[in-house]
């Protein structure tokens, strides 16, 4: 066992508190001593987005990452429309152009989406090409883009890739420093060769997300860090050793289950999540 505080700032994704409004997220996160927020664009009113984003800094928070309204290149279960690749890329570009000034240096998180014919190789080629093009937009606006490999339960539904190494193959294929990795422990903790993959990622890790695992009973069944099977402390140590010094973001989805965390005290979820991460770090 080692001593010392968890070396990452504490962040919460707005997906964790889906029942709350954007304004409630900001004010309540600040009151709960959350350091930084992962903004979910779907919570913003397009007519008031600039006004809403301005209150983040007013409450002493920073933006550690942005989840665009459309964040996959191919259509997905969560965001099926528009179907056109060009339209989806245009929407992603628009998200960067609108929100980057409120999130300097932060990554915009994307994943591949589901290739219409299940062609993983083509999906990786297309996403590599489109990310390389979007890197110019990110560079012009002072932000980055983080590609997230999803859990195998999402393959051909939300994603064509499910391992850190697959994501890194795409990232490295862009040849651009603005493109990096979103490392979500719930998605990748069962990958073979994970230790080596995290080491390979190194300074390409732009975002880290945490929750915990029980055998899923729905498409969205994540639990509070420390309450499940993921070796969070070990994964945080590997991530730290790879050079990451950013925020550890609690990202929980909890839908279509009898004990949905969305129907519980979400302030308590935020508090318990921080305690779970700190305990996991201290225990390794």
Task: Give the predicted meaning of each segment.
Residues 1-33, 57, 94-97, 104-105, ...:
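Histidine-acidic metal/acid-base catalytic patches
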Residues 2-14, 65-77, 112-115:
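N-terminal small/glycine-rich loop or linker at the start of catalytic domains
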Residues 16-18, 41-43, 69-72, 112-116, ...:
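Active-site-proximal loop/turn and secondary-structure-junction residues that shape catalytic pockets
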Residues 28-47, 67-72:
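N-terminal substrate-binding region of glycoside hydrolase catalytic domains
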Residues 38, 65, 108-109, 146, ...:
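Conserved beta-strand positions in the central sheet of alpha/beta enzyme cores
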Residues 38-58, 118, 155:
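Glycine-rich, proline-tolerant flexible connector loops at the mouths of alpha/beta enzymes
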Residues 72-79, 116-120, 152-157, 216-221, ...:
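A short acidic, helix-capping loop that chelates divalent metal ions and anchors anionic groups
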Residues 78-180, 190, 267-269, 276:
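Active-site acidic/histidine proton-transfer and metal-coordination neighborhood
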């Amino acid at each position: 066992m080692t001593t010392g505080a968890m070396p990452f700032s504490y962040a919460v994704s707005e997906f964790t508190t889906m029942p709350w409004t954007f304004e409630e997220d900001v004010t309540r996160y600040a009151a709960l001593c959350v350091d930084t927020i992962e903004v979910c664009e779907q919570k913003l009113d397009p007519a008031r987005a600039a006004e809403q984003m301005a209150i983040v800094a007013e409450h002493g928070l920073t933006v550690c990452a942005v989840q665009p309204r459309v964040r996959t290149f191919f259509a997905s279960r969560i965001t099926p429309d528009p179907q056109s690749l060009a339209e989806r890329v245009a929407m992603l570009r628009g998200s960067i152009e609108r929100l980057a000034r409120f999130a300097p240096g932060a990554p915009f998180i994307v994943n591949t989406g589901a290739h219409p014919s299940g062609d993983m190789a083509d999906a990786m080629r297309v996403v590599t090409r489109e990310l390389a093009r979007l890197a110019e937009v990110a560079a012009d606006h002072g932000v980055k883009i983080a590609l997230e490999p999803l859990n195998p339960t999402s393959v051909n539904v939300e994603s064509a890739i499910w391992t850190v190494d697959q994501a890194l193959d795409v990232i490295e294929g862009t040849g651009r420093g603005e493109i990096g990795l979103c490392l979500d422990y719930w998605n990748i903790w069962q990958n073979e060769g994970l230790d080596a993959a995290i080491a390979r990622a190194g300074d390409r890790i732009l975002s880290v997300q945490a929750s915990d695992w029980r055998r899923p009973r729905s498409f969205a069944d994540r639990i509070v860090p420390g309450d499940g099977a993921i070796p969070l402390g070990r994964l945080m140590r590997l991530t730290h050793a790879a050079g990451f010094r950013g925020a550890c973001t609690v990202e929980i989805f909890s839908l279509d289950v009898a004990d949905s965390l969305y129907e519980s005290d979400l302030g308590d979820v935020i508090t318990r999540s921080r305690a779970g991460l700190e305990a996991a770090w201290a225990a390794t």
